[in-house]
Amino acid sequence: AWKLFDDGV
């Protein structure tokens, strides 16, 4: 995942 897409992966 990534901070802008913070999905908890």
Swiss-Prot record:
Keywords: Antibiotic, Antimicrobial, DNA-binding. GO terms for biological process: defense response to bacterium. The keyword DNA-binding applies. One of its GO terms (molecular function) is DNA binding. It comes from the Eukaryota. The keyword DNA-binding applies. The synthetic peptide inhibits cell proliferation and induces apoptosis in cancer-derived cell lines Hep2 (IC(50)=1.5 mM) and HCT15 and, to a lesser extent, in non-cancerous NIH/3T3 cells. The mode of action is presumably an arrest in the G0/G1 phase. Has DNA-binding activity. Antiproliferative, proapoptotic and DNA-binding activities are increased by acetylation at Ala-1 and Lys-3. Has no hemolytic activity against mouse erythrocytes. Has antibacterial activity against S.epidermitis (MIC=60 ug), B.subtilis (MIC=30 ug), P.aeruginosa (MIC=30 ug) and E.coli strain ATCC 8739 (MIC=30 ug). This is Anticancerous peptide 1. It comes from Cycas revoluta (Sago palm). The lineage of its organism: Eukaryota, Viridiplantae, Streptophyta, Embryophyta, Tracheophyta.
